[in-house]
Structure formats: C-alpha cells, structure tokens
C-alpha cells in the first residue's frame, strides 16, 4: 500500500546533521556550545561576602591615636608675659578728656545753629517789587541759601547797554567787605525794560557768632550808581536754631535780629500807579475771589 510506504519512510532513521556540514565548521568547536547563553558582564556577589570584604578592609586601615605633649617630654601650657610699657605707640591713642569735651561742645553748637535768610523774598509781593524797581532802578528779585553759599537773581532797569552789577557783602559786621560781580542772564520772556543778573557767593567757615553777614547791591550805568540796601536795613543772613519739629527759629540770645525781621506793610486803600487788584482789596475784600486772583507772584 502507498500509505504503508510513507509511514515507513517517516519512521526511518534520518542521517546525522553533521553530514550536511563541512568538516571545517565542525573542526575544533562544539556545535552545542554555540547555542548556550552568554555569561552576564555583571558579577553578583552575595551580601555576606561583601560585608566580610568590608570588614577585612577596615581592619587593614591604620588606627588613630591621641598622644599628649607631656608623654614626649613637652610642656602642656605656654605662657607669654606682656610688658605694660613695651609698646609705646599705644600712648598715641590716649586722648585728653578735656579736649574731647571741647570738641563735642563745639559740634553740638554747630548742629543746633544754622544759617537762614533774615528777610522774605522781595518778589513775594510782586507789585511792591515792581514799584521798588521803578524807583531804585535795581532790586533783589530772589535769594536762597545753598549749603555754604548765597545765590540769587537781581533785576535792573534797562537804562543803557553797558551795565555793571555787583554784590557788596561783609562777614564781620562791615569791618571789611568784598565786591562780587554778577553775571548777566538772557531774558527768557524777552523783556525790554529790565535785565536780569545772577550771583553765587561762598560763605567762609568758622564765622564768629557775634559777627553779622550782610550784603547790598550796586548798579552802575552811564556813570550813575544805584543802590538796593533793603530800605536801609541791608540784606542779612542770620543764625537760627533747630527745633525738634525741624523748624528754623532765630536765636533767642540775639537781640538785634528783630531789626532784620520782615515787617508786613499794613493794608491800605492807596491807589498805585499800576492800577493793581491790590487797590480793590481794601474796598472789596471778596473781589479777588470772584475773579480768582491771588496776591502771590504770577510765576
């Protein structure tokens, strides 16, 4: 039967696999070993073995030892004696207490007193300022103290092209004085009837408290000299004391300071030549509030 023949062929022994391979492939190697898994690259040790290795490694290290100095014949302490007069440079650091008291007293006096202006700004009342300028041909416009210097501006009538404006100032109650030239300033608003000059004067330090600081202004043009001396009182810089609230007040021990304080002119109903709103202030006090016109300078 054909089926019996096929079964016999399948059950027959197959030829060995090495007959299909060349002799060079089988020489010197084991065919079965080629299909074995590779050995892992990481070597895993047991936990007990790692601990034993660390213990043996710690035993091999050198042990730390503490040795005292006396065991080697050395002293346990070191004593150094300082002489009281060994260093003479320390004597230079000694201060005399009396000198320190004088220094602190002068510093305290300097802190309590400062310099302030002994007059109000001339241009605060602009109409009165214009009247003085028309009358005297020269008038201080404004002034301020900047640290240790006096600065301000001056208005003069434009009489001639050639002008010379100077500040005459004294720091010792007119025992001596200095004339300082003022600098011309270009008129911003292009006024033709007046010119503006500026000045900056340094105040020397250590001025005695009893000496006065005063100045006035001279204006020379076409051989004529005009003066502005604050109506005979001169412009003064006085000393003041600081109060706890930070307000400047004149020193109480100066009796002559009252003569330099500004006295407000009593209000009257006189008509001035400019026809200003100040005239109607006496007749109709509420008139300025109607037109929202104030008494302060317009700038």
From Swiss-Prot:
The N-terminal region is required for binding to PP1, the central region is required for binding to glycogen and the C-terminal region is required for binding to glycogen phosphorylase, glycogen synthase and phosphorylase kinase. Acts as a glycogen-targeting subunit for PP1 and regulates its activity. Activates glycogen synthase, reduces glycogen phosphorylase activity and limits glycogen breakdown. One of its GO terms (molecular function) is protein phosphatase 1 binding. InterPro entries: CBM21_dom, CBM21_dom_sf, Pase-1_reg-su_3B/C/D_met, PP1_3C, PP1_regulatory_subunit_3. It comes from the Eukaryota. GO terms for cellular component: protein phosphatase type 1 complex. PROSITE patterns: CBM21 (PS51159). Residues 130-238 form the CBM21 domain. This is Protein phosphatase 1 regulatory subunit 3C. Interacts with PPP1CC catalytic subunit of PP1 and associates with glycogen. Forms complexes with glycogen phosphorylase, glycogen synthase and phosphorylase kinase which is necessary for its regulation of PP1 activity. One of its GO terms (biological process) is glycogen metabolic process. Keywords: Carbohydrate metabolism, Glycogen metabolism. It comes from Xenopus laevis (African clawed frog). A motif (PP1-binding motif) lies at residues 65-68.
């Amino acid at each position: 039967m054909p089926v019996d023949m096929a079964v016999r062929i399948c059950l027959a022994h197959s030829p060995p696999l090495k007959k299909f391979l060349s002799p060079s492939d089988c020489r010197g190697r084991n065919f079965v070993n080629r299909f074995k898994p590779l050995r892992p690259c990481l070597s895993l040790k047991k936990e007990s073995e790692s601990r034993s290795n660390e213990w043996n490694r710690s035993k091999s290290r050198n042990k730390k030892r503490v040795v005292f100095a006396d065991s080697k014949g050395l002293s346990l302490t070191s004593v150094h004696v300082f002489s009281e007069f060994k260093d003479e440079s320390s004597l230079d650091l000694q201060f005399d207490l009396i000198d320190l008291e004088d220094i602190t007293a002068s510093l305290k006096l300097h802190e309590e007193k400062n310099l302030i202006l002994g007059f109000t700004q001339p241009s605060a009342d602009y109409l009165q300022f214009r009247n003085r300028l028309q009358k005297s041909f020269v008038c201080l416009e404004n002034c301020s103290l900047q640290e240790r210097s006096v600065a301000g501006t001056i208005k003069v009538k434009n009489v001639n092209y050639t002008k010379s404006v100077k500040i005459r100032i004294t720091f010792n109650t007119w025992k001596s004085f200095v004339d300082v030239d003022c600098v011309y300033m270009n008129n911003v608003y292009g006024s033709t009837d007046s010119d503006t000059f500026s000045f900056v004067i340094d105040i020397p330090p250590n001025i005695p408290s009893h000496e006065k600081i005063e100045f006035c202004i001279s204006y020379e043009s076409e051989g004529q000299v005009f003066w502005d001396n604050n109506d005979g009182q001169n412009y003064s810089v006085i000393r003041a004391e600081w109060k706890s609230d930070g307000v400047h007040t004149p020193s109480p021990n100066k009796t002559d300071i009252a003569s330099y304080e500004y006295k407000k002119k009593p209000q009257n109903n006189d008509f001035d030549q400019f026809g200003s709103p100040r005239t109607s202030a006496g007749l109709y006090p509420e008139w300025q509030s109607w037109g929202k016109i104030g008494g302060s300078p317009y700038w």
